[in-house]
């Protein structure tokens, strides 16, 4: 009976970790969409709400790490059970970083001054955001369902995000060269595009965590990359 009780308690601990990761993931998905929406609509209030939401993401990461460490100390899990707990901590770390990147985009809304807003660039950013948000949702679903093929689909899709980012950078550079008055807006958009691309990288990280949880080893394959840009993703102090 004691061992049965211990097993049920451990299952309950794992279920709670999964629930917390799902809650954190839902918040991260919302922050991605709202940060770009705020930027496109110049909605400072929405941008500020995204910034404020980052504190909730940070708190959820702390709770997940504390519960994970406590579960390891109490249950002393091995093999697949231990990988479940380590996986939850790794996913939480990536989601916290996604929150930071979305927060940085939310902060930039207030800095936009120009009315310059070419439709082609905006549509490109929206397309890239939709793709990355879909990848984040898909990989979190794969994590919850232990669906390795679905996780690997996200992993392979990272190259498409990189290619869109590179194309958008080229368009932005063209607009800046054509008219110096466009430079400020285009630079902010560059930061945001690079942040979205980095969010895609974190979705790829989560896919690799799913592989680790299921297969019991790290992925050795080289990531498919199509990004030809080099750009800082956050401003100093963020």
What positions do the PLM features span?
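Cytosolic, long alpha-helical scaffolding segments
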Residues: 1-238
């Amino acid at each position: 009976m004691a061992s049965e009780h211990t097993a049920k308690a451990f299952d309950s601990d794992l279920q709670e970790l999964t629930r917390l990761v799902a809650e954190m993931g839902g918040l991260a998905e919302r922050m991605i969409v709202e940060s770009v929406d705020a930027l496109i609509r110049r909605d400072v209030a929405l941008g500020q709400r995204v910034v404020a939401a980052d504190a909730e993401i940070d708190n959820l990461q702390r709770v997940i790490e504390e519960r994970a460490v406590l579960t390891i100390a109490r249950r002393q899990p091995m093999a697949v059970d231990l990988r479940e707990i380590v996986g939850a901590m790794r996913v939480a770390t990536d989601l916290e970083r996604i929150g930071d990147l979305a927060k940085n985009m939310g902060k930039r809304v207030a800095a936009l001054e120009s009315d310059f807003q070419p439709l082609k660039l905006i549509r490109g950013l929206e397309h890239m955001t939709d793709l990355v948000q879909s990848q984040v949702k898909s990989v979190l679903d794969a994590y919850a369902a232990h669906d390795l093929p679905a996780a690997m689909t996200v992993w392979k899709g990272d190259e498409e995000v990189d290619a869109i980012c590179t194309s958008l950078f080229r368009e932005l550079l063209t607009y800046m060269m054509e008219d110096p008055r466009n430079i400020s807006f285009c630079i902010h958009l560059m930061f945001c595009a690079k942040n979205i691309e980095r969010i895609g990288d974190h979705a790829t990280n989560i896919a690799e965590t799913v592989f680790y949880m299921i297969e019991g080893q790290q992925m050795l394959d080289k990531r498919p990359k199509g990004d030809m840009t080099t750009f800082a993703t956050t401003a100093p102090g963020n």
